[in-house]
Amino acid sequence: PVVHCLFCSIVDGSSASNIVYDDDHCLAFMDILPMTPGHCLVIPKRHVRDIFELDDDDAAHVMQACRSVANIVHDRLEPLGINLVNNNGAAADQSQFHFHIHLIPRYGRDRLLHPWERSYGNPDQIRSIAEILRGEREIPRPE
């Protein structure tokens, strides 16, 4: 069954959006729930659910589009910085299941806060996880 995708309908023009960037592979449009003024979403035109379905070509095109949109936002809105945010899966707060990157201009003293408290990790645990990621050891599983 074909599931309706809002972002695909923006790509094909059947849903209205405030498009700010358009090339052969990607589209960027204003987020209707902006965290800050100028908050855009950058998407591949081809439907891809998340980063795990994203191929190398789409990944390269999306990052190039992010860079282009970031330069436009930087030049025209003059933010102090820009965050690129990508959520993959419901547990990571993905709400639209078409791969997208939030491009969020930062102006200082805005309402977007980093909700995590940063502290140094356990060096042994960090080293152990790195070994797992490099394929040097297996994830310990209960027997």
Regions found by a protein language model. Give the residues of each.
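HIT superfamily nucleotide-processing domains
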Residues: P1-E143
